């Protein structure tokens, strides 16, 4: 036991000792460790408490305990101060972080410089204030600067700059886009704001106007920005605004053409006029031009022409002047017509075209018309027509060319002046100036009144449509020249000659139509384009009316697009109205039925649209009545014309729109037609192009063409009606003219239309026309051939352009829709 105890005790003793040793040792160890830890902790805590200071203090450590302690103290003070400051600044972390870096720097400095550490101790001794102050002085500045820098860099980079930059950029982008849209929208809004479609166009013109300048030679540029540019060109066309147009457009809208155009016409006209027509044109043109519409149109046309015309029309017609002149030239050639129509330069272009066309046509038609007028000696006319058709066709197709040709031709024949003036004038002049007076003159009178100026002018306005209409109408105008005498004339003539016009128209129309129809038809193809243009034009009218009516017509146009679509749609309307007309037209349509149908439809639509539109817009009725009255049949044409006009206008609009977008609906049709037309028209110089397009149109249009032809016929008919149409045209015209698309259309259209017009007229003659159209249309009949021939040319010439143009136009159309 003892041993055990001892052992235990020993063990225990040993254990106890060990334990004791351990205990004391442990406590010692613990203390030492603890102490060390404590010191470390203190150090760490202090630095840690310093936070940033930790590093600094560490940095100081190399310097010396003094520095370290002093610094540490200072850091504590600083830290406290910093905390206060942080709280105040609320920049805790950033400040702290910066502070740490700065403090490190300071520490380094302190370490490096004993003085600094000493100072700090002194500072410490002095009190927190000194370090604080020191710190403030040194650190804060650095810190602030650093912080500022950091903050700025961070904020600026991330927050401030990005935000600001982004915002501005975003704003800019948004604004640009928005603005861009706004402009468009505004423009759109503007359209409503302006007056009717025209207003739109005016607005559009304005909108485009800047662009339009570009557009001014959109023909070239449209390609550039097919959509906008084209649209603008279209717009320009539509606007007719060549920049000048812009004003013009406004006036156009207001005046519809007269004032507006006047200027351009003058200038342009002058150019055109310059051209020969110059004097004459000037006169006439002026009259017509006066009717600025024409002028405007010139602008319109010019521009459009340039664009469009330039493209085809102008090229041909304008060909001469095309580009530069284009407006001028355009006008000049067109101008001639243009000039005289120049009044509707656009129109002119269109008109020009119309005039030219008309002129050409006119010449041609004049020939034709002359014949018409003559057809007023139909026979002569016929010959001329055919001749003209041919011419015309050429004119039509050629119209551009012809225009040039016509122009040239007429110039020769008419001598540009004659033609030109004749054309418009010529028709008048040629037309027998009497006619011209009647026609142009009369038209001027009337025309001025209704037709040519109207037509042209109106056409201008309308003319684009009218012109188109002119063309259609112009054709009417033109035709009207031809017809115009009849139509315009017709209105005059028609009015008086209504019979005759019908007759004239009829024969001419018929013949011309037939022929022309063929031609038209050919043109149909061409004309289709023309027609299409017409249709398109019609759409323009439709559209334009639609423009005013656009929807309506446009719808029709859209529908019309269908119609000629447009035609057709229009047709429906036409049909509707034209049902009656349709018959007639339809009749023609009947013959032409298929194509015609659209035609018919279209005319009806045109009529309808037009009518409504025209009526609506126009007083189509009135017009129509007259037209109808004169045309009677034509009334439908009137309707149609109006409609057509509307369509045409619409088309222009449509085209424009179409060409532009709206037309697009219309455009569709219009576009299609317009596009086509635009294309065609644009193309028409495009017309010519139209031919191509036309070809397409023709192809396409074959029916379309037919339709178009028909349409054209019908439309043309409306052209006949055109007079009424014109009236509408005036309104519409402005639009259309403004639309220019008509213009656009006009070129080809016009020629075509013109051709068609005859056809249209034919519609009066519908039967004959139908037969002829049908034959012609389908066959393109001799005329067709001729026209075709020309058509072909246009097709090729214009075709190429046409396609290009078409694309552009289409693009434009899309844009337009936007």
Curated annotation (Swiss-Prot):
What residue spans carry the region label Disordered? 1-61, 195-727, 773-805
Q: Kindly indicate whether the keyword Glycoprotein belongs to this entry.
A: no
Bias (Low complexity) ranges: 490-511, 544-560, 697-715
One GO MF term on file is: calcium ion binding
Q: In what ranges is there compositional bias, type Basic and acidic residues? A: 773-794
Q: What is its main location?
A: other
GO biological process annotations for this chain's record? negative regulation of protein sumoylation
Please verify whether the record's keywords include Phosphoprotein.
yes
Matching InterPro entries = FSCB
GO CC field: sperm fibrous sheath; sperm principal piece
How is the polypeptide modified once translated? Phosphorylated by PKA upon spermatozoa capacitation conditions.
Swiss-Prot/TrEMBL keywords? Calcium, Cell projection, Cilium, Flagellum, Phosphoprotein
Q: Where in the cell is it found?
A: Cell projection, Cilium, Flagellum
Q: Where are residues bearing Phosphoserine located in the sequence?
A: 25, 57, 182
On assembly, the entry states: Interacts with CABYR. Interacts with ROPN1 and ROPN1L; the interaction increases upon spermatozoa capacitation conditions.
Described purpose of this protein according to its UniProt entry: May be involved in the later stages of fibrous sheath biogenesis and spermatozoa capacitation. Inhibits ROPN1 and ROPN1L SUMOylation. Binds calcium.
Write the protein's name. Answer: Fibrous sheath CABYR-binding protein
Recorded source organism is Bos taurus (Bovine)
Q: What gene makes this protein?
A: FSCB
């Amino acid at each position: 036991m003892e041993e055990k105890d001892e052992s235990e005790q020993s063990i225990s003793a040993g254990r106890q000792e060990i334990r004791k040793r351990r205990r004391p040792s442990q406590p010692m160890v613990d203390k030492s460790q603890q102490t060390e830890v404590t010191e470390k902790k203190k150090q760490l805590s202090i630095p840690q408490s310093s936070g940033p200071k930790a590093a600094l203090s560490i940095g100081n450590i190399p310097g010396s305990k003094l520095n370290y302690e002093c610094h540490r103290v200072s850091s504590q003070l600083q830290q406290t101060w910093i905390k206060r400051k942080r709280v105040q600044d609320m920049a805790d972390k950033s400040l702290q972080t910066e502070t740490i870096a700065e403090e490190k720097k300071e520490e380094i400095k302190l370490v490096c410089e004993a003085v600094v550490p000493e100072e700090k101790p002194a500072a410490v001794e002095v009190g927190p204030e000194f370090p604080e102050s020191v710190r403030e002085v040194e650190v804060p500045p650095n810190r602030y600067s650093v912080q500022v820098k950091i903050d700025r860099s961070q904020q600026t980079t991330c927050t401030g700059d990005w935000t600001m930059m982004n915002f501005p950029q975003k704003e800019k982008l948004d604004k640009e886009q928005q603005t861009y849209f706004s402009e468009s929208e505004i423009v759109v809004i503007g359209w409503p704001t302006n007056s009717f479609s025209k207003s739109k166009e005016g607005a559009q013109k304005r909108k485009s106007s800047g662009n339009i300048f570009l557009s001014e030679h959109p023909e070239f540029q449209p390609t550039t920005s097919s959509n906008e540019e084209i649209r603008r060109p279209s717009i320009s066309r539509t606007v007719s605004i060549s920049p000048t147009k812009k004003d013009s457009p406004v006036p156009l809208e207001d005046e519809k053409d007269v004032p507006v155009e006047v200027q351009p016409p003058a200038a342009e006209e002058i150019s055109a006029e310059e051209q020969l027509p110059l004097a004459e044109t000037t006169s006439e043109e002026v009259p017509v031009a006066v009717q600025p519409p024409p002028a405007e149109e010139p602008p319109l046309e010019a521009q459009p022409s340039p664009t469009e015309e330039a493209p085809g029309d102008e090229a041909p017609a304008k060909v001469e002047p095309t580009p530069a002149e284009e407006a001028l030239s355009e006008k000049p050639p067109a101008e001639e017509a243009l000039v005289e129509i120049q009044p509707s330069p656009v129109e002119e272009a269109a008109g020009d075209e119309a005039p030219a066309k008309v002129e050409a046509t006119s010449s041609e038609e004049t020939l034709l018309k002359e014949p018409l007028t003559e057809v007023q000696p139909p026979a002569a006319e016929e010959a001329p027509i055919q001749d003209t058709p041919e011419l015309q066709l050429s004119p039509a197709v050629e119209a551009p060319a012809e225009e040039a040709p016509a122009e040239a031709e007429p110039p020769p024949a008419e001598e540009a002046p004659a033609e030109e003036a004749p054309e418009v004038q010529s028709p008048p002049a040629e037309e027998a100036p009497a006619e011209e007076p009647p026609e142009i003159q009369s038209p001027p009178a009337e025309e001025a009144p209704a037709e040519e100026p109207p037509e042209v002018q109106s056409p201008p306005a309308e003319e684009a449509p009218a012109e188109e209409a002119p063309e259609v109408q112009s054709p009417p105008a033109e035709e009207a020249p031809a017809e115009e005498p009849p139509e315009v004339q017709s209105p005059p003539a028609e009015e008086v000659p209504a019979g005759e016009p019908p007759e004239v128209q009829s024969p001419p129309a018929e013949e011309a139509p037939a022929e022309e129809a063929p031609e038209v038809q050919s043109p149909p193809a061409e004309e289709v384009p023309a027609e299409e243009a017409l249709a398109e034009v019609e759409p323009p009218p439709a559209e334009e009316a639609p423009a005013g009516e656009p929807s309506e017509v446009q719808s029709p146009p859209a529908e019309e697009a269908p119609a000629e679509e447009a035609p057709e749609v229009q047709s429906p309307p036409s049909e509707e109205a034209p049902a009656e007309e349709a018959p007639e037209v339809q009749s023609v349509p009947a013959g032409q039925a298929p194509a015609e149908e659209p035609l018919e439809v279209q005319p009806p639509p045109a009529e309808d649209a037009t009518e409504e539109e025209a009526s609506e817009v126009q007083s189509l009725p009135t017009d129509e009545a007259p037209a109808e009255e004169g045309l009677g049949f034509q009334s439908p044409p009137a309707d149609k014309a109006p409609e057509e006009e509307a369509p045409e206008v619409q088309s222009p609009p449509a085209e424009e729109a179409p060409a532009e977008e709206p037309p697009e609906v219309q455009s569709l049709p219009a576009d299609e037609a317009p596009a086509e037309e635009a294309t065609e028209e644009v193309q028409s110089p495009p017309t010519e192009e139209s031919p191509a397009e036309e070809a397409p149109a023709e192809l396409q249009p074959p029916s379309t063409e037919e339709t178009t032809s028909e349409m054209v016929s019908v439309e043309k008919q409306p052209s006949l009606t055109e007079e009424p149409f014109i009236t509408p045209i005036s309104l519409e015209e402005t639009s259309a003219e403004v639309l220019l698309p008509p213009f656009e259309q006009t070129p080809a259209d016009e020629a075509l239309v013109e051709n068609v017009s005859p056809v249209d007229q034919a519609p009066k003659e519908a039967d004959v026309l139908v037969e002829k159209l049908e034959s012609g249309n389908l066959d393109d009949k001799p005329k067709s051939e001729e026209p075709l021939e020309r058509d072909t040319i246009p097709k090729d010439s214009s075709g190429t352009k046409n396609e290009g143009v078409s694309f552009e136009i289409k693009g434009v159309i899309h844009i337009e829709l936007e």
